[in-house]
């Protein structure tokens, strides 16, 4: 690539590996903080277990940046509803974000949270991250992460500018328009 741009790959961090186990407590802390800030925690959700679902890493020399997704699933079925008009489902609380690893010190670079409702009894589809990192283009201290998203048959790409000062979405384009 020209103009001082460098392309670098992203790798999946293996669940249960020492690297995963080192990152998980920080990710859980960020999840809990985001839940409190966004008021996503209630008596019904607090007992549901949290899970670190995905972690991806990009390494450029001594600099390492991670993308993660974590979630909590809560059954939303209630005994006093009409299941014909309000079918049972699961509320999924998701927190995703980026971490900078500077010599073993993890610094959050931005997180986002979402609530989703998934109807029980329907095929869940393939298990995949909400955003699949495809690669990173870097220039100096800035990195642009190329991410692919999918919901049902809808696909899109999003570019995230990730730097030590934070994260911002630069562009989102539907896959059928690329």
Stretches found by the model and what they are:
Residues 1-178:
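Exposed acidic/polar residues on beta-strands and adjacent loops within beta-sheet cores, strongest
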